[in-house]
Amino acid sequence: MRYLLQRILFYAFTAWAAITINFFIPRMIPGDPVKSLLARYQGQMSTDAIDSLYVLFGLDKDASVWSQYVDYWQQLLRGDLGLSFTAFPATVSEVISDALPWTVALVGITTIISFVLGTGLGVLAGWRRGSWIDGLLPTTTFLSSVPYFWLGLLAIYLLAGPGSFFPSSGGFEPGLVPAWDQYFIPSAVQHSLLPALTILVSSVSGWILSMRNMMVTVAAEDYITVAHAKGLPERRVAVGYAARNALLPNVSGFALALGFIVGGTLLVEIVFSYPGLGFLLFRAVGAKDYPLMQGIFLVITISVLLANLIADVAYLLLDPRTRKEG
């Protein structure tokens, strides 16, 4: 329990540091976002109205940085991430909530499939060395070394195009309204196939290799030999003894992969113009939408920290040594 408490305190400090950095970085970037907003909409406003916009966006020139920092924390604790410059007067929370489900659906499901498939193949490859799975390792290793975006471009070139089943961009057919109906869901699934295939091909080999190497190491341990000597079934030894202990490093990696779901496939979403959080961040950076950038970075930070905490809890459950040390 003490171990878990230490980890929670560490993550709390890390979250505070990340949020503090998230507050200061946009204020260090050259440019005036309010003037950019006025120029974009070609607005003519009085001086008092412009000053009100600065206050509205938390950039009051008459307030000290410390005062702005305190106000920023008060807004966060209320769940208020501010107003988006590019989607004004929509709030950052509303803009992120529109894009987040797309990323979670695409990358989340693909990451889980990749982990389950790669771990299962890794167990077989490590337990039955020299099988047909070993023959796949050079190819999968090569594909894992290829950047996401390059595989995406290659997939578009080879599989997408006029008359093809695979759309080359977007999240659904133009003219459809996002809804849980028989028209939108098939279209959304169809548009997600190529991005999902790109992520799956790039990531699955990492799980295969790491699990295979751990299985080879664990298979040489004395307790595996003892289990065989006791006459235990092969399946029970492989799954209950070898795979369970070999799985621990992959659990940590899987938790981190879940944490990076919301921001780990930026380039894939850009290549396919997929309406997820990564593509939203790309547009926010181009438009210097600082509140939106801060909101997205905050979501990514919290996601990664929560994923690490989940990994620590999983370690406590899977590894008795951790509980004894705590």
Question: At which residue positions do the language-model features occur?
Answer:
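Alpha-helical transmembrane segments of integral membrane proteins
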Residues: R2-Y3, I96, L100-I133, Y148, ...
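Generic alpha-helical secondary structure signal
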Residues: D48, S52, S64, Q68-Y72, ...
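Hydrophobic alpha-helical transmembrane segments of membrane transport/permease proteins
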Residues: A15-Q68, G163-F184
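Residue-level recognition of pore/gate-forming positions within transmembrane alpha-helices
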Residues: Y11, G43-Q44, F115, T141, ...
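Hydrophobic alpha-helical transmembrane segments of multi-pass integral membrane proteins
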Residues: F13-I21, V65, Y69, G108-I112, ...
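Membrane-water interface segments at the C-terminal ends of transmembrane alpha-helices
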Residues: I21-P30, D71-Q74, T139-G170, T198-L200, ...
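N-terminal signal-anchor/signal peptide hydrophobic helix marking the start
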Residues: L5-Y11
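An internal, D/E-rich "acidic patch" concept
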Residues: D60-T119
